[in-house]
Amino acid sequence: MIEALLVATGGFFGAITRFAISNWFKKRNKTSFPIATFLINITGAFLLGYIIGSGVTTGWQLLLGTGFMGAFTTFSTFKLESVQLLNRKNFSTFLLYLSATYIVGILFAFLGMQLGGI
């Protein structure tokens, strides 16, 4: 039962944090590139890598990794924004967003794991 509570607590704070960051960027970003989701997902990849790489206890992994990072990052919004770029025929931004998210996300997850293991 405590495990579910840790995940739920982390998830609550992760979702609220993502909501606040997304709204902040949407008010300031006037480009077609979905910068808020991109930065959230890249930051989340790095932090999750760091959490796992640092060897924290299972409780902290559940709270921060599964809960907070699971709600903070958003694969579904990434896919929705990608489809919206395609529907608007904004092919160059679509390709940039898609490739940058995957490539930079993997690199940042690796970097986080390396730094977490120091």
UniProtKB/Swiss-Prot annotation:
Q: What is its main location?
A: membrane
Cite the InterPro entries for this sequence: FluC (IPR003691)
For this record, the Gene Ontology CC terms, alphabetical, are:
plasma membrane
Which BP terms from GO are recorded? cellular detoxification of fluoride
Q: What are the TM regions of this chain, as residue ranges?
A: 1-21, 33-53, 55-75, 93-113
Q: Which family is this protein grouped under?
A: Belongs to the fluoride channel Fluc/FEX (TC 1.A.43) family.
Query: What residues does Na(+) bind to?
Result: 70, 73
Which species is the source of this protein?
A: Bacillus cereus (strain ZK / E33L)
Q: Which domain of life is it from?
A: Bacteria
Per the record's keyword annotation, is Transmembrane helix included, yes or no? yes
Record keyword Isomerase present: no
**Per UniProt, what is one GO molecular function of this protein?**
metal ion binding
Q: Which Pfam families match?
A: CRCB
Q: How is its activity regulated?
A: Na(+) is not transported, but it plays an essential structural role and its presence is essential for fluoride channel function.
Q: Which gene encodes it?
A: fluC2
Membrane topology term reads: Multi-pass membrane protein
Q: Which keywords describe this protein according to UniProt?
A: Cell membrane, Ion channel, Ion transport, Membrane, Metal-binding, Sodium, Transmembrane, Transmembrane helix, Transport
Locations listed in the record? Cell membrane
Protein's name in the database = Fluoride-specific ion channel FluC 2
Signal sequence coordinates: none
Q: Known catalysed reaction(s)?
A: fluoride(in) = fluoride(out)
Q: According to its UniProt entry, what is the function of this protein?
A: Fluoride-specific ion channel. Important for reducing fluoride concentration in the cell, thus reducing its toxicity.
